[in-house]
Amino acid sequence: MLLTFSYIPALILHLDIEKFSNTGKILYNLATDLAFLAILFIIYRKTLIKDWQNFTKNLGNNLEFAFKYWLVGVIVMIISNLLITFLAPNAIAGNEEAVRNLINQYPLYMIFSVSIYAPFTEELIFRKGIKDCIKNKYIYILTSGIIFGSLHVISTVTTPYDLLYLIPYCSLGITFAYLYTKTNNIFSSMTMHALHNTLTIGLYLIGTTL
């Protein structure tokens, strides 16, 4: 999911990214990431500026409110992951495994990609973008959560057990969508998404150094 946009310029320009050096791959992906961030900012600049001003006016309360909803989503994720571990003891989410491999290869780039790029782009697309298209609150929440979860899982499915990971990913997506409907402020879900991803990558990096 993180690197999807980077393939578009490569297809248009007929670039073979796999032939790039490691440094070349990082620079290419960083350039396309920054370009996509700029495009989304231009498209949603009015919403982003307005929501940022409103969010920072009462930053402490807004963060506390958003944190409570994120915590519920994390609890659901933990419970569902424990059930998956019980059913398939050696299983690991394909998306998580792919991200771990990339972290091992390009740690600094992946910290930026996971902690900043992904929350910004995914919240604007899966929360703001979908909400603009679907007016019914409940249909929007389910649609946003299911699409978010599916795109994090489907591309890495290799066994039927991998489909079980739709539950934790969709539950987190539903949590972020519900949070956005409650606050009508994209930074509520964006900050919690960034917190979630940063904690995840931080714990992984700490674990690999112990």
Describe the predicted segments one by one:
Residues 19-29, 64, 68, 135, ...:
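Membrane-water interface of alpha-helical transmembrane segments
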Residues 8-9, 26-42, 63, 75, ...:
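Alpha-helical hydrophobic membrane-insertion segments
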Residues 1-47, 95-97, 109:
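Alpha-helical transmembrane segments in multi-pass membrane proteins
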Residues 41-51, 179-183:
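Structural signal for the C-terminal ends of transmembrane alpha-helices
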Residues 78, 82, 86, 104-210:
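Transmembrane helix-loop-helix hairpins at the membrane interface
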Residues 14-24, 48-118, 210:
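Juxtamembrane helix-loop-helix connectors linking adjacent transmembrane helices
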Residues 1-4, 68-76, 141-147:
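Alpha-helical transmembrane segments
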